């Protein structure tokens, strides 16, 4: 196994074990603003990931949702991009739709991606040129020929705000679940045709999933039609995203942007 991938998998498992110590237990919840909660579990997992990954690769840069950003990463060839607990709202609600997300970026490209759900024990993993796996079994993006049969994984908050209402009769099913990263893993495993978001996301939300999607034979683009180059000074990706099987992404892009 790729040594960097092995390191990322072990780190994600360690963080996941820590998170489970807090799951359905007492912990402190803070609000970072814009209804964006953070818990002591997020911080504990972040500290463990940084300790494990940066101790092993001190020359790499670091970008995490829960760490104060440093411009030092912008000069690094390789950067760890992590979200220690993607799906914090679901974690707080006791819903098992959250993951530890660990990616390694080299010259702007995600070359290692790991998503670990510590409740279900699902381990999505990929390294550039080596394929994508779910619990060591190969996975691949899949899609149906007809758009009106396709399953789209989307956001619970976007659904509540009515952003997907115009497309309710276009696709086969709009399935709203939590955690951007988890949705990318499920899509890479062929459990849905597409993951799509109509709102901006950050690099740490999607980086590991992007690697896994790529290695599962799919692609990820923003709603301007461009792939993401990672380790940017501004980490927000606007205006939204689509990922999945290549042909399904093209069809969905045309529908969501009104270019079909």
Language-model features: where?
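Short loop/edge segments at beta-strand edges and connector loops
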Residues: 64-66, 136, 178
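Residue-level signal for inorganic ion chemistry
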Residues: 19, 42, 53, 88, ...
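DPxDG-like acidic metal-binding loop motif
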Residues: 73-135
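An extended, acidic
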Residues: 142-260
């Amino acid at each position: 196994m790729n040594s960097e991938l092995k390191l990322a998998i072990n780190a994600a498992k360690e963080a996941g074990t820590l998170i489970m110590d807090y799951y359905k237990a007492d912990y402190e919840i803070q609000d970072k603003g814009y209804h964006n909660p953070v818990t002591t579990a997020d911080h504990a997992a972040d500290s463990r990931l940084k300790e494990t990954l940066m101790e092993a690769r001190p020359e790499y840069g670091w970008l995490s949702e829960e760490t104060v950003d440093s411009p030092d990463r912008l000069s690094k060839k390789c950067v760890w991009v992590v979200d220690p607990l993607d799906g914090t709202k679901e974690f707080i609600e006791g819903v098992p739709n959250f993951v530890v997300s660990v990616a390694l970026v080299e010259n702007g490209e995600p070359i290692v991606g790991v998503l670990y759900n510590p409740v279900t024990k699902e381990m999505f993993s990929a390294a550039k040129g080596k394929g994508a796996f779910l619990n060591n079994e190969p996975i691949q993006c899949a899609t149906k020929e007809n758009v009106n049969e396709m399953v789209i994984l989307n956001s619970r908050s976007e659904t509540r705000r009515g952003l997907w209402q115009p497309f309710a009769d276009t696709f086969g099913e709009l399935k709203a679940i939590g955690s951007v990263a988890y949705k990318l893993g499920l899509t890479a495993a062929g459990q849905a045709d597409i993951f799509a978001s109509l709102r901006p996301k950050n690099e740490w939300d999607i980086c590991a999933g992007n690697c896994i999607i790529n290695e599962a034979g799919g692609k990820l683009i923003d709603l301007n039609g461009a792939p993401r180059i990672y380790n940017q000074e501004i980490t927000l990706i606007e205006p939204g995203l689509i990922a999945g099987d290549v042909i399904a992404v093209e069809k969905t892009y045309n529908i969501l942007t009104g270019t079909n």
